[in-house]
Every structure is written in structure tokens, then in C-alpha cells.
Amino acid sequence: MNTTSTHFVPPRRFEVYEPLNQIGMWEESFKNNGDMYTPGSIIIPTNEKPDSLSEDTSHGTEGTPHKFDQEASTSRHPDKIQRRLAQNREAARKSRLRKKAYVQQLETSRLKLIHLEQELDRARQQGFYVGNGVDTNALSFSDNMSSGIVAFEMEYGHWVEEQNRQICELRTVLHGQVSDIELRSLVENAMKHYFQLFRMKSAAAKIDVFYVMSGMWKTSAERFFLWIGGFRPSELLKVLLPHFDPLTDQQLLDVCNLRQSCQQAEDALSQGMEKLQHTLAESVAAGKLGEGSYIPQMTCAMERLEALVSFVNQADHLRHETLQQMHRILTTRQAARGLLALGEYFQRLRALSSSWAARQREPT
């Protein structure tokens, strides 16, 4: 029995939209092996020229497809199409991920740009312009600011806007006729708003505790009264006490006891801060002069600075507890007046900062 060797055409990569090219190669292979058994299903009709048919199919020209073409098209193309669809879906997924990352990068850049504009406005207000130049030391702080701190400043700006809205709402309600249930809802919302600020500060302190401690996110007049990144609870109670009238004897006693407890807690935190400053100074100053390398001192100082975040959180916890205790001592209407007075107090400090900055820019 004579065995004719079959010459296989090397496979060639073809696309879904090139079905006839591969079929042409298969036909050429069968044509070159004429002594090979050929099934009747793929016999080329006698009235067609094999050479011209092969040439037409290899160039993708239209013709009457024979049964083999139909079988190959139906049996081979679905797998190719499914693979191509899967590749397209994967490419689309990666494209969406790249687009999402790009949008996030744009948003971060936008936040940084807004913050730089705010810092520039703040520099103008605080008189950092000298002639036609800018004090770059005052603004160098912005260059190294992390995206987390930029996001905090944006959040704090929205927080102040919401506080102003709540103040207007409380003022309107207290001058009108409203039920205690509606008033209680406004008081609870205002309390939650302050608690939200404490959570925001706690997250920001983990990123840059010096930024929170310095109060750079507040106006200059607010920074003048700053105590461990915020207001001093005992002093604030002293300012707000006249707005609580009329108070019962028991309420007055409770408020005085609360203020005394706040003073004791504030003294303990202040003493802890002084001790931390003392130990931090010793850590930085340790070592011999002229060593050139400060790595051991910096490592020790960094470990001690971790306690600074705890001080900020404890101070905010004291503010949180003071507000809650005042809410417990006062009636709903008294608490609403107290929150209104507290909000207006901060509004007046911000207005004082703006007025002082405007006075500095006036010609003498």
C-alpha cells in the first residue's frame, strides 16, 4: 500500500474577519496531494477551474462557497469569536480601571489646586505680601502637604458652611413658634455636627499631628484661643453661661461642677504636654556635638511624638464629653440657645480675623 506523505501547511494567525484565507490554504494542501483520497463532499465541480478558485479564495473574493467552506465557517468561527469577545471585554475592563485611576488623580490635583488658592488668599489676608513678592516660607507649607490634609481642609470648609446653615436655622426657630420635638431634632443634629468635626480631626492627626496642633485650618483669631488643637472647654463654658438663663439652682450647680471638672482635666493634659515637650527637647539635644548624624536622636524623638496624637484625641474627647454633659444638664430650649451662642461665637472670631486682615491692608 502506497502511503503518500501529507504536507501540512504551517498554521498562520488569522483574524475573525479573515475566514477565506485559511480555507484557501487548506484547499491548496489538498490540491498538491492529488493521489490522496478525497471525499465527495469536497470534490471541486468540473466546470470550475481549481487555480482560479484557489486564487479567488486566497484573495477573499466572493464566490459560491462549497460545503466544506460552510462546515469550516460554522465549526471554527464561534470559538474565535468568543475568544475575541473575551479579549475585548478584558481590554474594556482595563480601560475602565485606567480611566478611574486617571479621574482620581485629577480629583487629587484639583483638591491640591484649591488648597493652594486658599493658602494664597490666606497669605494675602495675613499680610505675607512684601512689596510685589510673596514670603515663600509662609507658603512652603503647602508644597509638602499630603492629599489627606488637603481633603481635611476641604471637609472642614464644608463643615463650616453646614454650621452656618444650622446657626441660621436655630436662630429662626428660637424666634418662632416650634414644638420641643422639632427643636430637639435640631439640637441633636448640631451636636452630631460637632462630633463629626472631632472624628475628622482624629483622622487628620494621624496624618500630620503638627498641622492639627498648629490650627492652620482655622483663622488667626481662632488660633489665638487655641488649646491642643481646639477650644478650651472651661473657658467656653464661662463665655456661654450668660446665654443659658434662666437656670435653676441645681442646673447652676451642675454647670459650675462641670466647669471645675473641665479645668482639672485641662490642667492634667497641659502638664502632660509640658512633660512631653521637655522629654522631646532632651531627645533631640542628646548626643555629642559634631557627630554629623542625627539618626539616633531623630528615632527617639519620633517615638515620643506618637504620644502627641493621643493628646489631641484626649483633648477632643474632653470637648465631646463637655458638650454631652451640657446637653444633659440643660433643657432642650436652653441647649438650643447654647449651641446658637457657641456657633455665633466662632462666627465672630472668624469675622474678627477678616476685619483685622483688612485693617492691615489699609494704607497708613
Curated annotation (Swiss-Prot):
<feature type="domain" description="bZIP">
    <location>
        <begin position="78"/>
        <end position="141"/>
    </location>
</feature>
<comment type="subunit">
    <text>Binds DNA as a dimer. Interaction with the Dof domain proteins OBP1, OBP2 or OBP3 enhances the binding to the ocs element. Interacts with RAP2-3/EPB, an ethylene-responsive element binding protein. The reduced form interacts with NPR1.</text>
</comment>
<dbReference type="InterPro" id="IPR025422">
    <property type="entry name" value="TGA_domain"/>
</dbReference>
<protein>
    <recommendedName>
        <fullName>Transcription factor TGA4</fullName>
    </recommendedName>
</protein>
<feature type="region of interest" description="Basic motif">
    <location>
        <begin position="80"/>
        <end position="100"/>
    </location>
</feature>
<feature type="region of interest" description="Disordered">
    <location>
        <begin position="39"/>
        <end position="79"/>
    </location>
</feature>
<keyword id="KW-1015">Disulfide bond</keyword>
<dbReference type="Pfam" id="PF14144">
    <property type="entry name" value="DOG1"/>
</dbReference>
<comment type="function">
    <text>Transcriptional activator that binds specifically to the DNA sequence 5'-TGACG-3'. Recognizes ocs elements like the as-1 motif of the cauliflower mosaic virus 35S promoter. Binding to the as-1-like cis elements mediate auxin- and salicylic acid-inducible transcription. May be involved in the induction of the systemic acquired resistance (SAR) via its interaction with NPR1. Could also bind to the Hex-motif (5'-TGACGTGG-3') another cis-acting element found in plant histone promoters.</text>
</comment>
<comment type="similarity">
    <text>Belongs to the bZIP family.</text>
</comment>
<dbReference type="Pfam" id="PF00170">
    <property type="entry name" value="bZIP_1"/>
</dbReference>
<keyword id="KW-0175">Coiled coil</keyword>
<dbReference type="GO" id="GO:0000976">
    <property type="term" value="F:transcription cis-regulatory region binding"/>
</dbReference>
<keyword id="KW-0539">Nucleus</keyword>
<dbReference type="GO" id="GO:0006351">
    <property type="term" value="P:DNA-templated transcription"/>
</dbReference>
<feature type="coiled-coil region">
    <location>
        <begin position="257"/>
        <end position="277"/>
    </location>
</feature>
<dbReference type="InterPro" id="IPR004827">
    <property type="entry name" value="bZIP"/>
</dbReference>
<feature type="region of interest" description="Leucine-zipper">
    <location>
        <begin position="106"/>
        <end position="120"/>
    </location>
</feature>
<keyword id="KW-0238">DNA-binding</keyword>
<keyword id="KW-0805">Transcription regulation</keyword>
<keyword id="KW-0010">Activator</keyword>
<dbReference type="GO" id="GO:0005634">
    <property type="term" value="C:nucleus"/>
</dbReference>
<dbReference type="GO" id="GO:0003700">
    <property type="term" value="F:DNA-binding transcription factor activity"/>
</dbReference>
<feature type="disulfide bond">
    <location>
        <begin position="256"/>
        <end position="262"/>
    </location>
</feature>
<feature type="coiled-coil region">
    <location>
        <begin position="79"/>
        <end position="127"/>
    </location>
</feature>
<feature type="compositionally biased region" description="Basic and acidic residues">
    <location>
        <begin position="48"/>
        <end position="79"/>
    </location>
</feature>
<keyword id="KW-0804">Transcription</keyword>
<feature type="domain" description="DOG1">
    <location>
        <begin position="149"/>
        <end position="359"/>
    </location>
</feature>
<dbReference type="InterPro" id="IPR046347">
    <property type="entry name" value="bZIP_sf"/>
</dbReference>
